Amino acid sequence: MAHAIDDLKMVHEEEMKNYDRIESAVVSVMRRHGCKIIQTPTFEDYDTYGTYFPQLQREMIKTISSEGEVLVMRPDVTVPLVKTASREYPDARQLLKFGYVSMVFREYYGKSTHGKYFLQSGGEVLGDETPECDGEVMVMAAEFLESVGIRDMRIDLGSVAYMDALFEELRLSKEELSQVREFLEKRNLV
């Protein structure tokens, strides 16, 4: 009798229809914002992720190539996207907008689910560090969620640079800044 591997499953027609619906809606949003739709390779060099995401090493799904190289199934889309963009578009001042909907392969544990792969979508904007660009990315994230029927949402920003700029603009006292940072740290522990 064949042994079933935990967390691997057949994706049936109804779920495929849902994937197609989500992909179509999200790609439509990305195209409205001027993104080029891309697909990164399914297999990537292990060392690339070991360097940039050492915290993912245990969650990555690894294999050995026929040449003996350690490869990983795509655990993330941003790293290969940025590597490829820097190689194919060497003019760093050029505005580049990319969008993707891809299966990502790594172990994950959510509040009610776990598995070894999931559908991930996103947009990457390179070459524009303005607040307006940050705002557009946040609008695009909200439009992604709305396009698939999610109306009740909260978007959290995790960028230290963004938060530092916001705090500077708010001109908080040291005590106020300390209290806000404490609240933010506690929020991340919940």
Where are these regions (language model features)?
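Extended, charged alpha-beta segments that form solvent-exposed binding/catalytic grooves
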Residues: 1-79, 83-190
